[in-house]
Amino acid sequence: MQIYIVGGAVRDELLGRPNADCDYVVVGATPETMLAQGFRPVGKDFPVFLHPNTHDEYALARTERKTGHGYHGFIFHAAADVTLEEDLARRDLTINAMAKAADGTLVDPFNGQQDLASKTLRHVGPAFAEDPVRILRIARFAARFSDFSVAPETLALMRSMVACGEVDHLVAERVWQELAKGLMEQKPSRMFEVLRDCGALARLLPEVDKLFGVPQRADYHPEIDTGIHTMMVIDQSARRTFTLPVRFAALTHDLGKAETPADILPRHIGHEERSVRLTEQLCARLRVPNDCRDLALLTARYHGNIHRAADLKASTIVTLFEKTDALRRPERFRQLLDACLCDFTGRLGWENRPYDSPQYLLGALAAVASLNAGEIAVACADKTKIPERIHAARVHAIKQLLDNPGEQPEQQ
């Protein structure tokens, strides 16, 4: 039997990029051969084995055949007579369809090295059209390799897949999985650019697609277009290496602007409430994890208040802290401020503009956190008024801070 390193590890080595994961393909072996050599089977749908010492995954060379719609509509054939080229032919992109032998020989039957040099994302063959997840994967690779372009024939094939309804059969969990990975790439806006270009964005994330072409006030948004603004915001979240919940909140914070009545454009009065509703809808459909959903909803609802923090009354700031559970969840509140920072700087010419709201609100939060709510409760004779007394004490603490800014408590 012959063992080859395949896929991303080969690609990244040629690009000079780090890659901690190695995928191995074994040609000329059977499951019995692997077991006899001490490998442990782990694959459910096709033969994958763990190396007895390194615990790396080794997959038998296999082919696949389409049997139905969507991601799960395949049957696999793995046998000793499946060749390396047959295994590589089922892969999505030419740059991922290369292998390296034990002696270092590069196996490149689909000219992946040439496409790396020309910075082209090109599908391997017609089997690409059988798996709609590959549309999402190409878009994700565009976000990772942001200076690569999609080959014209590949883009045409992606458009035909969308037109025939293949993407409509994608399961929610797989869409979210690829979306999350794309948001964590170097330039996530490229993912949405490619999805929009092939028509998949309108089918998978219509709430985001509808933002493009919606105008905003030029004095606050020199980039004008809400869709372009959203792309700038998610790229800001990537540039600052923020967490996935922050990046997802950056994507969804302005969804409500797509439903602003035409007669009040380019103003967007009440878009925060509309954004909350649309974000809830999107999160339910894609089964978004709770941490991402919750931060996205808070950002959609409160980003306007946070931008105006210096103009808010002390009582409004306290209400903001209470509504966002900032005292019990300070780390999440910081993430909320991170998302708002991306929104503020994700505007044409505003990328490096100072943004004072986070420091201002964290100072106010520290002042409120320094209060002893238990002591206030004990001192309150009428127990029904405890929440009211605590709220009033918090308002007073912030008023004192505003009157004496030099005496700001230390932030935790």
UniProtKB/Swiss-Prot annotation:
Catalysed reaction, written as an equation: a tRNA precursor + 2 CTP + ATP = a tRNA with a 3' CCA end + 3 diphosphate; a tRNA with a 3' CCA end + 2 CTP + ATP = a tRNA with a 3' CCACCA end + 3 diphosphate
InterPro entries linked to this entry: CCA_bact (IPR012006), HD_domain (IPR006674), NT_sf (IPR043519), PolA_pol_head_dom (IPR002646), PolyA_RNA-bd (IPR032828), tRNA_CCA-adding_enzyme (IPR050124)
Record carries keyword Cell cycle: no
Cofactor requirement: Mg(2+); Ni(2+)
Gene3D superfamilies: Beta Polymerase, domain 2 (3.30.460.10), cca-adding enzyme, domain 2 (1.10.3090.10)
UniProt superkingdom: Bacteria
Residues the record lists as binding ATP: 8, 11, 91, 137, 140
Residues annotated as binding Mg(2+): 21, 23
Domain HD: from-to ranges: 226-327
Record-level GO BP terms: RNA repair; tRNA 3'-terminal CCA addition
Family as reported in the entry's similarity comment: Belongs to the tRNA nucleotidyltransferase/poly(A) polymerase family. Bacterial CCA-adding enzyme type 1 subfamily.
Other comment: A single active site specifically recognizes both ATP and CTP and is responsible for their addition.
HAMAP family: CCA_bact_type1, CCA_bact_type2
Free-text function comment from the UniProt entry: Catalyzes the addition and repair of the essential 3'-terminal CCA sequence in tRNAs without using a nucleic acid template. Adds these three nucleotides in the order of C, C, and A to the tRNA nucleotide-73, using CTP and ATP as substrates and producing inorganic pyrophosphate. tRNA 3'-terminal CCA addition is required both for tRNA processing and repair. Also involved in tRNA surveillance by mediating tandem CCA addition to generate a CCACCA at the 3' terminus of unstable tRNAs. While stable tRNAs receive only 3'-terminal CCA, unstable tRNAs are marked with CCACCA and rapidly degraded.
PANTHER family: MULTIFUNCTIONAL CCA PROTEIN (PTHR47545:SF1)
Entry's free-text remark on domains: Comprises two domains: an N-terminal domain containing the nucleotidyltransferase activity and a C-terminal HD domain associated with both phosphodiesterase and phosphatase activities.
Subunit structure: Monomer. Can also form homodimers and oligomers.
NCBIfam families: PRK10885.1
Identification of the protein by name: Multifunctional CCA protein
Organism: Dechloromonas aromatica (strain RCB)
Taxonomic lineage: Bacteria, Pseudomonadati, Pseudomonadota, Betaproteobacteria, Rhodocyclales
